[in-house]
């Protein structure tokens, strides 16, 4: 790619990210995230948000931080579901396809590859300084490292990130 093509690609990426940005307040908490595909995937998705934050770091560092803070805010005792249903309710058809505890659950019950500490280090700073990231890793160790070998067990195939999307 030449410099002109790189500039055009960067402008296109910037436009798509800004177009897909969602911001609001839910349960008294300010949130902001990039919807992977507003029509089909309108909510916050764990590792998509990690990758979005890394890109936002170069375009708008405040959005980068907010994207990851929004992901952390969805944590329940350290578990961060692979989807946080922010901004619009989950319809019945989707509720039947996603692993959720109840129809009105704020997140799925399944996880995605734990890329949060890596994304935080690339986008915000030292992840060891953020206690909720440590809580997340403690939860993963306690509930998904079943043999104590630092390898996480998956409950269903989508948790690997190798799904049909």
Language-model-derived ranges and their functions:
Residues 1-44, 65-66, 70, 78-80:
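Low-complexity, Ser/Thr/Pro/Gly-enriched N-terminal "stalk/linker" regions
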Residues 42-68, 73-165:
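Aromatic-rich carbohydrate-recognition surfaces in CAZymes
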